[in-house]
Every structure is written in structure tokens, then in C-alpha cells.
From Swiss-Prot:
It comes from Mus musculus (Mouse). Residues 477-531 are annotated as: Disordered. InterPro entries: Glypican, Glypican_CS. This is Glypican-1. GO terms for biological process: heparan sulfate proteoglycan catabolic process; myelin assembly; negative regulation of fibroblast growth factor receptor signaling pathway; positive regulation of skeletal muscle cell differentiation; Schwann cell differentiation.
Length: 557
């Protein structure tokens, strides 16, 4: 009876070993012809590629079963997979930058065209209407438009002060032309001091100041917002992949080839976990990115109506014409008030004597009706901004679907990182803090990428400027694309996650993947979800233990 029982134990152990060996496709030596073909198509030499599977103890990233990959092949494919992901990221970034650039150039060109058309209308209409009141002061008007362009382009000018200085200079020159025999040079100071009370140009200066401040601030903040968004995308695209990510990408994309199943495509959730871990820092841009785009959509409300950007920027000449008309209409009253305030001036010995008859008249200009161009441009821009709002958090899924040849479904035929089979771990959340338990990529959540943290700050700064511009505030526009210094005591962790969470494993400083591949970590084999058979050497150990137990059984009795 004891011999029969002992034979039963031996039979069970042997059967288990045979069944598992047959059930694991990697345990049989198979042809590597398909892998050779794929490997050669990528430009690698086939001299070291085995004809059939070999033992895989030398592998450092892929599972160490039977394999079609040598150490050199694994290294080449690891570097190649990293370059493929970097290329895919750059393609996505360039596409987003192109979208933003298209919107920026369209709207920026339109606003500048409005200002150019206004100046052109002034140059065509003012000489005939105002004669030398305009022709002798063309530089003052030209300088005004030049400063308005500088302000629109983001120059650190104070628009209200710029306009006030223009009106003061213009008053001196025009009043001197109207009364050349009354105004010696020392009389002009008093005139300037009385200008605000005298209101020589009527309501035109005040109306232009109120409307232009809001209109130009809204227009330039929107255009600058597009520029900042594009610059953030460009700088984030330059952030290198971490070594842990490079290992995970190799395992995702090419370890199936080494395993001898190149036709197995990555399981969807497996791919998402790898990319969410690789792009954890990028996902942290999401909140401030959305805030910026929302603020840009909101500021477009300031483009419409009588005080809107299109009406005001394209109608600067209208307010200038009204100002000169008011000065001519109120010439006599204004002269009397100036004499009352400043006294009777001495006759200017260099004056032109009695006023000569000059060709002067009134100019009635109407604002040009909207062509609908800006409405179309803004409508397209708002639609594009809404489409790209979730760019950073949707990037892993987009890359998996479009670049990683992801399997359409998670089933027994997709690649789970170890073999063909279902992928069981849950998909991680978005952002750095949610990667603490990522089963595919080791992420140190206490070490955020500083370049990306700086870009998050740039997004915040630009959003605050847009919100100020919505209220009509003249914000100080520095170059928001400049890199921040990164100084300060904060480590950059969002909220208080650094205090609440601890990394699974403290990693060394991140450097680009070199040709020397790191060794397989002790946890690598534990990060599997498939219910696969253990390697054959495990069953040999089980088999020996079973023999010992069976042999010792009579003695226990």
C-alpha cells in the first residue's frame, strides 16, 4: 500500500511537469524565422540572430524563458523602442504646435491688418480734410501707430500713458499752428497744464483711452496665450524618457518578439499602464493647461461690440478725426479759456503773422462694418482649443491606439508583458501621484521633473494675465516663455502628496538610456498578471521535493 501511494505521488509530479512543459509554448524550441525577418527589416544585422529559440538566462528586460533574442538583440531593440516612443511623442507635439500656430497666425495677422488699415485710412483721408494740421504732424500720428503696434505685440508700455503723451504733444503742435502769433515757446507749459480742464479734443481722448485699453489688452493677451501654450508644448517635448520607462517600453513592444510570438499585440490596459507611468509628469500639466484654454476662450467675449477689439483696433483713426474736428470747432472758446488761465502772451517774433487761410474742414468717418473674418477665426480657434483641452491626459491612450499597435481587446491572445494572455491589473490614474502602485513602471513620485514644473508655472502666470485682461486691467507682459529659475524650497509635488505618499523604491537621478542595459530588478518577475506555468526548473525542484517526501513517508509513521 505504501509503495502504491508513493508511486501515485511520483506519477502526479511527473504529469504536472509534462503538462506545463507542453502548455508553455516557450518551452519548446521553435523557429525564429519570423523574428529574423522583422529584426532585419529594422536595419539590424542578422549575423547573430539564432535560427531557433535558445535559453534566455542572458536576457535583462524580457522574460527569461526560451527566446529568439541574444543580449545584443535585446539591447538594440530596447534602444529602438525608446527612439520610436520619442519619435511618436515629437510627432504629437509637432501636430499640437502646428494647430496652435495656425490659430495664432490667423488671429494675429487679422488684428495687425486692422491696425494697418486704420493707419492707411488716416493717411488717405486726413490730408484732404485737415490740410497742414495733419501734414505738418504726420510723424506724431505715425509714432502713435508704431507704439500701438509695440503694445499689441507685448512690449512693456503703459497704454494710458502712451495715449496721454500723444494728446499732449498733438495739442501743442496743433494749437501753435492755429495761433502762431500768440504762442512763444514759454507759453506751452501753461497750455499743457490746463489741457485736462480745457478738454480741447472733446470726449475723443477719454473714449479712445477707455476702449483701447480694454481692446488691446484682450487682443494681445489672447495672442500671447496661444504663444505660451505652443512654447510649453515645445519645451515639454524635450524632456527625456526615464530609464525605467525605456525598460517598460521595450517589454511592451518587443519582448513578444523575443518570446517568439511577434504577432501578439499589447493588451490595451497593459499599454495604458506603461504609457501612464512614462508620461506621469506630463499628465500633471492637465489642470493648468485647461485653466489657460478656458481663460482664452473667455477673453474672446471682449472682441465684439462697440468697445470690442475689432471695432476699436480698426477704428483708431475715427477717434483721431473726431479729436481734430473738436479742436477746430472749439478754437475760439478754447483760445479765450487759455488766455484766461495763462494770461495774454507776448507776440512770438518768429511767428508767421496773421493766420493764413488754410485748407481745413471737418472729416466724418464711419467705422467699417465687420467682414465676418474675425468671427470665423475665433470660432475655429475656440473649437480647436476645446479639442485639445485633454491633450496631456489622453496622450497615453492616443499613443497606444495610434502608435503602439495595441490589441483591440484584452483577451487570451494579447501580449501582457510575460506571455500571451489576459492582463489583470487595474489601469492607473493620471498624473505622478497616481503612479505609486504602477505595476509596469517604477515611478518615484517624490522627484517630479523640474522642466515640467516650470512649464506648469508658466501656464499659471499666463492664466492670471488673461483673467486680469478680461477685467480690462493693463497687465505687465514679460516674456512668459522664459524658463523659470526653479528656485525655492518646494520640491514641486502637487498638493501634499509628497507628505502622504512614499515611493515604492527610491530611484537614482534620471538619465537617458545608454547602451549598457541595467540588470533585471528583483521585482520584475513579480509584475505579472498572467496565469502562466512556472519555468521548468521550478518543476524539477518540486519534483525532487516530492520524491523526498514520498521516501520519508514510512519513517513518519
Amino acid at each position: 500500500m505504501e509503495l502504491r501511494t508513493r508511486g501515485w505521488w511520483l506519477l502526479c509530479a511527473a504529469a504536472a511537469l509534462v503538462v506545463c512543459a507542453r502548455g508553455d509554448p516557450a518551452s519548446k524550441s521553435r523557429s525564429c524565422s519570423e523574428v529574423r525577418q522583422i529584426y532585419g527589416a529594422k536595419g539590424f544585422s542578422l549575423s547573430d540572430v539564432p535560427q531557433a529559440e535558445i535559453s534566455g538566462e542572458h536576457l535583462r528586460i524580457c522574460p527569461q524563458g526560451y527566446t529568439c533574442c541574444t543580449s545584443e538583440m535585446e539591447e538594440n531593440l530596447a534602444n529602438h523602442s525608446r527612439m520610436e516612443l520619442e519619435s511618436a511623442l515629437h510627432d504629437s507635439s509637432r501636430a499640437l504646435q502646428a494647430t496652435l500656430a495656425t490659430q495664432l497666425h490667423g488671429i494675429d495677422d487679422h488684428f495687425q491688418r486692422l491696425l494697418n488699415d486704420s493707419e492707411r485710412t488716416l493717411q488717405e483721408a486726413f490730408p484732404g480734410a485737415f490740410g497742414d494740421l495733419y501734414t505738418q504732424n504726420t510723424r506724431a500720428f505715425r509714432d502713435l501707430y508704431a507704439e500701438l503696434r509695440l503694445y499689441y505685440r507685448g512690449a512693456n508700455l503703459h497704454l494710458e500713458e502712451t495715449l496721454a503723451e500723444f494728446w499732449a504733444r498733438l495739442l501743442e503742435r496743433l494749437f501753435k499752428q492755429l495761433h502762431p502769433q500768440l504762442l512763444p515757446d514759454d507759453y506751452l507749459d501753461c497750455l499743457g497744464k490746463q489741457a485736462e480742464a480745457l478738454r480741447p479734443f472733446g470726449d475723443a481722448p477719454r473714449e479712445l483711452r477707455l476702449r483701447a485699453t480694454r481692446a488691446f489688452v484682450a487682443a494681445r493677451s489672447f495672442v500671447q496665450g496661444l504663444g505660451v501654450a505652443s512654447d510649453v508644448v515645445r519645451k515639454v517635448a524635450q524632456v527625456p524618457l526615464a530609464p525605467e520607462c525605456s525598460r517598460a517600453i521595450m517589454k511592451l513592444v518587443y519582448c513578444a518578439h523575443c518570446r517568439g510570438v511577434p504577432g501578439a499585440r499589447p493588451c490595451p490596459d497593459y499599454c495604458r499602464n506603461v504609457l501612464k507611468g512614462c508620461l506621469a509628469n506630463q499628465a500633471d500639466l492637465d489642470a493648468e493647461w485647461r485653466n489657460l484654454l478656458d481663460s482664452m476662450v473667455l477673453i474672446t467675449d471682449k472682441f465684439w461690440g462697440p468697445s470690442g477689439a475689432e471695432s476699436v483696433i480698426g477704428g483708431v483713426h475715427v477717434w483721431l478725426a473726431e479729436a481734430i474736428n473738436a479742436l477746430q470747432d472749439n478754437k475760439d472758446t478754447l483760445t479765450a479759456k487759455v488766455i484766461q488761465a495763462c494770461g495774454n502772451p507776448k507776440v512770438n517774433p518768429h511767428g508767421s503773422g496773421p493766420e493764413e487761410k488754410r485748407r481745413r474742414g471737418k472729416l466724418a468717418l464711419q467705422e467699417k462694418p465687420s467682414t465676418g473674418t474675425l468671427e470665423k477665426l475665433v470660432s475655429e480657434a475656440k473649437a480647436q482649443l476645446r479639442d485639445i483641452q485633454d491633450f496631456w491626459i489622453s496622450l497615453p491612450g492616443t499613443l497606444c491606439s495610434e502608435k503602439m499597435a495595441m490589441s483591440p481587446a484584452s483577451d487570451d491572445r494579447c501580449w501582457n508583458g510575460i506571455s500571451k494572455g489576459r492582463y489583470l491589473p487595474e489601469v492607473m490614474g493620471d498624473g505622478l501621484a497616481n503612479q505609486i502602485n504602477n505595476p509596469e513602471v517604477e515611478v518615484d513620485i517624490t522627484k517630479p521633473d523640474m522642466t515640467i514644473r516650470q512649464q506648469i508655472m508658466q501656464l499659471k502666470i499666463m492664466t492670471n494675465r488673461l483673467r486680469g485682461a478680461y477685467g480690462g486691467n493693463d497687465v505687465d507682459f514679460q516674456d512668459a516663455s522664459d524658463d523659470g529659475s526653479g528656485s525655492g524650497s518646494g520640491g514641486g509635488c502637487p498638493d501634499d502628496t509628497c507628505g502622504r505618499r512614499v515611493s515604492k523604491k527610491s530611484s537614482s537621478s534620471r538619465t537617458p538610456l545608454t547602451h549598457a542595459l541595467p540588470g533585471l530588478s528583483e521585482q520584475e518577475g513579480q509584475k505579472t498578471s498572467a496565469a502562466t506555468c512556472p519555468e521548468p526548473h521550478s518543476f524539477f525542484l518540486l519534483f525532487l521535493v516530492t520524491l523526498v517526501l514520498a521516501a520519508a513517508r514510512p519513517r513518519w509513521r
